[in-house]
Amino acid sequence: MRKKRYVWLKSILVAILVFGSGVWINTSNGTNAQAATITQDTPINQIFTDAALAEKMKTVLGKTNVTDTVSQTDLDQVTTLQADRLGIKSIDGLEYLNNLTQINFSNNQLTDITPLKDLTKLVDILMNNNQIADITPLANLTNLTGLTLFNNQITDIDPLKNLTNLNRLELSSNTISDISALSGLTNLQQLSFGNQVTDLKPLANLTTLERLDISSNKVSDISVLAKLTNLESLIATNNQISDITPLGILTNLDELSLNGNQLKDIGTLASLTNLTDLDLANNQISNLAPLSGLTKLTELKLGANQISNISPLAGLTALTNLELNENQLEDISPISNLKNLTYLTLYFNNISDISPVSSLTKLQRLFFYNNKVSDVSSLANLTNINWLSAGHNQISDLTPLANLTRITQLGLNDQAWTNAPVNYKANVSIPNTVKNVTGALIAPATISDGGSYAEPDITWNLPSYTNEVSYTFSQPVTIGKGTTTFSGTVTQPLKAIFNAKFHVDGKETTKEVEAGNLLTEPAKPVKEGHTFVGWFDAQTGGTKWNFSTDKMPTNDINLYAQFSINSYTATFENDGVTTSQTVDYQGLLQEPTPPTKEGYTFKGWYDAKTGGDKWDFATSKMPAKNITLYAQYSANSYTATFDVDGKSTTQAVDYQGLLKEPKAPTKAGYTFKGWYDEKTDGKKWDFATDKMPANDITLYAQFTKNPVAPPTTGGNTPPTTNNGGNTTPPSANIPGSDTSNTSTGNSASTTSTMNAYDPYNSKEASLPTTGDSDNALYLLLGLLAVGTAMALTKKARASK
């Protein structure tokens, strides 16, 4: 019994092993894990199911084909594996490479690294540039010293918390938001987590930090930084920080960079009164009030925000460097009190009045390019300026800059402005207003459209319309020691409005369009039975207008809607058989040959199978749709003649109709057989099923002759005995007489003509009587037979 139980248990074990594809794995609840092994030689492509990995392993294992089998011993020989850039999607099978110490699977398409979970001999892993999200399988690889996983999809790095031997950890460009696992990795020498980190609590114990750079994450909560009180410099650029309240306690900070975050409220900064260098560029700041008390500030960067009001800066008189570029500034009057400024950026704003800088006499560098400044007279007193960048404005007169003799760097290039539009005419003339530092007019360098210059005017002779004319200027200028080219373009718009008229079958709409512009295409007109082709410059023919490329000329234009006529199908259906014609809208159909149908007369073509309207091929026109016309017929009526021995009656019956059966005709000595299509023989007409053909017919009454009684001998008729045993005296039956032969059951009428026969109205049930020339002969023969019979009977009796 025990032996049988052992065999049974052994069978179950074998079944489990087979079900597990020949692999026995013992995980021991996550401790003392053993790498997987294969128990029998197995084809490579069954172990490594990814085709690309199988090909790589074929080479590593020295095989010729991925279907070749390998043993666990073969797999144990592999210690390093370089498999980068092979398009590998799965590393299934790696769990059998028990002796791996180094692997490189970078630049593949991996998502699942589960097969690594028990490869505890690994010391270095490179799997950057994949699609890995779950790194749980790395949790027990405590021998790892190097781990590179940048450019993946990792969100949870908790499995790394026990990898205390790590000295290199690269996790940038992932989606990590929790770095708590890093708090115990005290041996780390190289760390990057430029990902989506929001929680900085794991940094709480790093109290010796004096400079911290957490750039390029998604940090929004920086409360843990309040514990890093030794911080003197904090660089937290390119994150998602919106609340900087925790920084209020970091009073030792003298440098703070929060460039590239989501800051709107900077109220906390009011307490950081030791700040000397503050970078708040590239945020969403509009209210600068909290900065009003940071009087130690010497350098303030506020570029690329949403600032339109800089009045809170008016009291920061210690400022030497101020950056206000790329904001929404129009009014810069508050800076007029910042008399210690030596460096000021105002470029890429909407400033047209630069006069508030006139009191900043310590300014050495001033940048206000890409604004709308046209008058620079307020700069005349800034004699300490050595760098002036004023390009891309609307400056036309350099005279106020003549006394800025300390300038060494100068930018006045690419001035550009557009004059107010003037109406187009053949001769256009405008004054030149561009002056150099001496006040002399700068002659145009180029003049568009063949224009000419006679100081002080530029003139154009324009035989045809152009939407604008322009001229350029370019002249080297020297101010102080700064030399540059004062250049720019002056554009003079020429306004020209013309009418575009759109015609649709006599209806007109008009749009005003400036010459040189694209026309807005009207809604496509609709015309029954037609397809819109486009807008053309003629009612027929002409050139089609292209609304994507054709521009309004310098004259009124007329555009006509042109259509192509649609074709439709007319289907003619005749008892399920169809033919068709293709006919243009409103065209006449060609009438088909009238169809024929046995027993019917063709009525015409109708728009319904029954009823409907008849199509008139002379006047009815093709509608804007496909149609079906149906052949309709009326049944013909034919005559059926009933012939009874030359006497006839008739019926009129529709084709395929049933005839009304006449009363059966009678004929003396005959029994009526029926109506036949021949006088003799032929086919009997069945009034219940036979239907009227497509022609007149004649049906003939056919009869069968009744049997005749034998004649009597000597003119006497022996008595007959009826069934009751009584005798009946014989009666003479004279042919042609008005008598009855009761023994035969036949009756004869004295009437020998059928002129009055009406088979439908007769009230008699008997056949009509007729004359019969053979009756006398039959009677005599009958009498002779009776006489002979009686004689023989008598003789027989005598012989007895």
From Swiss-Prot:
Residues modified to Pentaglycyl murein peptidoglycan amidated threonine: T770
Biased composition (Low complexity): 711-753
Subcellular location: Secreted, Cell wall
Pfam families cross-referenced by the UniProt entry: Flg_new, Gram_pos_anchor, Internalin_N, LRR_4, LRR_adjacent
Coiled-coil spans in chain: none
Region 3 X approximate tandem repeats, type B, annotated ranges: 518-706
Disordered: region residues: 705-757
UniProt topology in membrane: Peptidoglycan-anchor
Motif LPXTG sorting signal positions after renumbering to this chain: 767-771
LRR repeats (start-end): 77-98, 99-120, 121-142, 143-164, 165-186, 187-207, 208-229, 230-251, 252-273, 274-295, 296-317, 318-339, 340-361, 362-383, 384-405
B- repeat extents: 518-587, 588-657, 658-706
InterPro entries listed in its UniProt record: Cu-Rt/internalin_Ig-like, Ig_E-set, Inl_IR, InlA, InlB-like_B-rpt, Internalin_N, Leu-rich_rpt, Leu-rich_rpt_4
Domain LRRCT: 416-505
Domain LRRNT: 36-76
UniProt record similarity statement: Belongs to the internalin family.
Name of protein: Internalin A
Species of the source: Listeria monocytogenes serotype 1/2a (strain 10403S)
